[in-house]
Amino acid sequence: MSFFDIEAQSSKGNSQQEPQFSTNQKTKELSNLIETFAEQSRVLEKECTKIGSKRDSKELRYKIETELIPNCTSVRDKIESNILIHQNGKLSADFKNLKTKYQSLQQSYNQRKSLFPLKTPISPGTSKERKDIHPRTEAVRQDPESSYISIKVNEQSPLLHNEGQHQLQLQEEQEQQQQGLSQEELDFQTIIHQERSQQIGRIHTAVQEVNAIFHQLGSLVKEQGEQVTTIDENISHLHDNMQNANKQLTRADQHQRDRNKCGKVTLIIIIVVCMVVLLAVLS
């Protein structure tokens, strides 16, 4: 092989490795994008849970609508425009699940935003209204020569306005307290609802685990029952085999005894014949 052939093979191998390296690099970049999308979705989910709670505010909703949701949408569009997402089954399945979760987060945010609108705080009355509430009095001198000054009370502002102002302030304080209590009760009910949902989820998971354990126990009991049945059948077969063996041994013993009897009779006959022949010869 010449030097040029070796160079041609090495260049061919390098040309085959370059596309593979490029594909692996693109796949890694796509995986990083999916991880970024998952992380931003988790941040969005965490911030959406604050809607309707004490930490809810205009700044929070502005951040969700102008920063978190657009960032997630931008990363999602980048992933969808990547060709490799349709060629890699695992990454495609992960992205599909994240995309479905992101859509549900958007719907949840819109629902919570409409369910918990932000309330504007009650502002105190203007200075003009407060001036109207206070009784207006003016000092007049009835007699220029007299040193006494009489107070003239305006008919449109009786002295009872002080009590009315106090009642109005009490009413405003009560309304503010009621609104604060209603918001606290709403937050408390929301927290209780979330905790109950989590408890129900945990109970459901525990029930599923218990069902799985009972299913496994049922399978084990069934297997043990089959094994016990097999052992019982084997014991029955062994008992039958032992009985058959005892019968065969009894028959063999009886047959051996019969053969021994026949041998003894034959031996006696032979002895008698020999004695008769011997006596005949001697006589």
UniProtKB/Swiss-Prot annotation:
Belongs to the syntaxin family. It comes from the Eukaryota. It is a single-pass type IV membrane protein. Associates with VAM7. Residues 8-25 have a biased composition (Polar residues). Residues 283 are vacuolar. GO terms for molecular function: SNAP receptor activity; SNARE binding. InterPro entries: SNARE, Syntaxin, Syntaxin/epimorphin_CS, Syntaxin_N, T_SNARE_dom. It is found in: Vacuole membrane. CDD domains: SNARE_Qa (cd15840). Residues 28-48, 84-111, 169-189 form a coiled coil. Residues 1-26, 116-146, 162-182 are annotated as: Disordered. GO terms for cellular component: autophagosome membrane; endomembrane system; fungal-type vacuole membrane; SNARE complex; vacuolar membrane. Present with 414 molecules/cell in log phase SD medium. This is Syntaxin VAM3. One of its GO terms (biological process) is autophagosome maturation. Residues 190-252 form the t-SNARE coiled-coil homology domain. The chain crosses the membrane at residues 262-282. Pfam families: SNARE (PF05739), Syntaxin_2 (PF14523). Keywords: Autophagy, Coiled coil, Membrane, Transmembrane, Transmembrane helix, Vacuole. Required for vacuolar assembly. Provides the t-SNARE function in a late step of the vacuolar assembly. Required for homotypic vacuole membrane fusion, autophagy and fusion of biosynthetic transport vesicles with the vacuole. Required for the delivery of alpha-factor receptor-ligand complexes to the vacuole. Residues 127-144 have a biased composition (Basic and acidic residues). Its main location: membrane.
